[in-house]
């Protein structure tokens, strides 16, 4: 937990850093104290997103930031399978930002450097295949032939599945409060750059979660009951952090 949390000291002043730590304890609670992997993933995901924002949106030309993102990407991709999805989302956001702003060729060295961060996880996956190291939870996806037309049709076009997923998301108080906090912060600060950046990353991850829930070969209710409270931690912390960042940036400008 400490490397990304040390970075938060540089992000905020003393008062706002304490506010961030309070938010962190409220969102992660036991995950932070015990050191559960999902809390670790949420922290690395949030600060990787923040550094990407600083480098490619705020145009901070800092190799220090770039190298930290590179290390965070490697750690994130090796922690859990969700981390791989997060890294791919952030890399996609980097591509979209640079192509839309016509800065791709200007930043191509940075992009290539960050792309190389997925090499360790690729090597690890190759080793797993060569030594027949399998994950039983992933193998059942293959055994159940989840990508068959009938399976996908029954799950993806089932309105009850969407309703159930939405219900579990809504019932997570911390997640709803984080969205409200982000919206309130945007209403008062009008910081479109921070708001749209964080919203695009958060929604991309939530969309990927919905897809995974829809194609799960397990009972959907059981899957949601056992996983939502853990995996929703990452977008919750992301929205809360960027909501606080909007307010902090506004207060700094006023002063």
Positions of predicted regions on the chain:
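Transmembrane alpha-helix segments characteristic
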Residues: 14-25, 68-71, 192-219
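Hydrophobic/aromatic-rich transmembrane helices and adjacent perimembrane loops
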Residues: 38-44, 79, 85-86, 222-247
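Transmembrane helices and adjacent periplasmic/lumenal helix-loop junctions
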Residues: 28, 36, 67-96, 118-126
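Membrane-interface helix-loop-helix junctions at transmembrane boundaries of multi-pass membrane enzymes
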Residues: 9-17, 58-64, 99-112, 184-203
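Juxtamembrane "helix-exit" motif on the non-cytosolic side of transmembrane helices
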Residues: 28-30, 99-100, 125-132, 210-221
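Membrane-lumen/periplasm interface segments of specific transmembrane helices
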Residues: 96-97, 107-187, 202, 206-207
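Membrane-embedded helix bundles of polyisoprenyl
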Residues: 1-55, 65-76
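Alpha-helical transmembrane segments of multipass membrane proteins
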Residues: 41, 76, 80, 120-124, ...
């Amino acid at each position: 937990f400490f490397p990304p949390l040390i970075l938060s000291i540089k992000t905020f002043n003393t008062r706002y850093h304490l506010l961030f730590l309070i938010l962190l304890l409220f969102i992660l609670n036991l995950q932070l104290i015990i050191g559960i992997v999902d809390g670790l993933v949420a922290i690395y995901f949030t600060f990787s997103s923040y550094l990407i924002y600083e480098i490619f949106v705020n145009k901070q030309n800092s190799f220090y930031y770039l190298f930290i993102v590179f290390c965070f990407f490697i750690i994130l991709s090796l922690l859990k399978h969700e981390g791989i999805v997060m890294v791919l989302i952030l890399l996609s956001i980097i591509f979209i930002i640079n192509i839309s702003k016509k800065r791709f060729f200007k930043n191509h060295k940075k992009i290539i450097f960050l792309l190389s961060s997925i090499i360790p996880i690729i090597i690890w996956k190759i080793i797993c295949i060569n030594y027949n190291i399998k994950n039983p939870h992933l193998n059942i996806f293959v055994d159940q032939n989840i990508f068959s037309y009938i399976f996908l049709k029954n799950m993806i076009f089932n309105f009850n599945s969407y309703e159930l997923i939405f219900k579990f998301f809504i019932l997570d108080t911390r997640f709803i409060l984080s969205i409200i906090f982000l919206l309130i912060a945007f209403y008062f600060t009008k910081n479109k750059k921070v708001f749209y950046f964080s919203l695009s990353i958060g929604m991309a991850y939530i969309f990927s979660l919905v897809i995974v829930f829809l194609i799960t070969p397990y009972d959907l209710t059981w899957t949601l009951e056992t996983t939502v409270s853990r995996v929703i931690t990452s977008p919750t912390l992301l929205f809360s952090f960027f909501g606080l960042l909007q307010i902090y940036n506004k207060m700094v400008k006023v002063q």
